[in-house]
């Protein structure tokens, strides 16, 4: 369950930012993750709740947004979402119909999008 280590990192960043800005109360944090990260949102929520209990961050709301997998065909430069995300190594481009290399444009990210503080 790598969500626990991700939450530990998130909380460290949040506390550092709050300290730098003289803020005491976190109301909400929004994180974004890509489809390829294998993050389980419920596990992320659970770890966030457990790790914030009894701290100044307790009661803060964690919002989670999934970023879809988007690929760019190296032949025609078309941007597309594969139908079967389990077989991304053997994909035919829906535009040029060639089975060629592609670049992952989105789907691997994990970041804090914003914090709401008091």
Curated annotation (Swiss-Prot):
Note the InterPro entries from the entry. Answer: Hydgase_Ni_incorp_HypA/HybF_CS, HypA/HybF
> What is the superkingdom listed in this entry's lineage?
Bacteria
- HAMAP family documented for this protein: HypA_HybF
UniProt cross-references to Pfam families, sorted A to Z: HypA
Function summary:
Involved in the maturation of [NiFe] hydrogenases. Required for nickel insertion into the metal center of the hydrogenase.
Report residues binding Ni(2+).
2
Q: Which residues bind Zn(2+)?
A: 73, 76, 93, 96
Keywords of the record, alphabetical order, are: Metal-binding, Nickel, Zinc
Q: Which family does it belong to?
A: Belongs to the HypA/HybF family.
The name of this protein is: Hydrogenase maturation factor HypA
Q: For this entry, list what GO says about its biological process.
A: protein maturation; protein modification process
Task: Cite the GO molecular-function annotations of the record.
Answer: nickel cation binding; zinc ion binding
């Amino acid at each position: 369950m790598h969500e626990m280590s991700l939450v530990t990192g998130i909380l460290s960043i949040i506390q550092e930012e709050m300290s730098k800005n003289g803020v005491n109360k976190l109301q909400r944090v929004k994180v974004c993750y890509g489809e390829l990260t294998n993050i389980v949102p419920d596990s992320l929520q659970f770890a966030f709740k457990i790790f914030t209990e009894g701290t100044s961050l307790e009661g803060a709301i964690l919002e989670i947004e999934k970023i879809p997998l988007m690929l760019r065909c190296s032949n025609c430069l078309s941007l597309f979402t594969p139908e079967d995300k389990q077989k991304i190594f053997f994909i035919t481009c829906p535009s040029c119909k060639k089975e060629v290399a592609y670049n992952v444009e989105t789907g691997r990210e994990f970041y804090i999008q914003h914090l709401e503080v008091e």
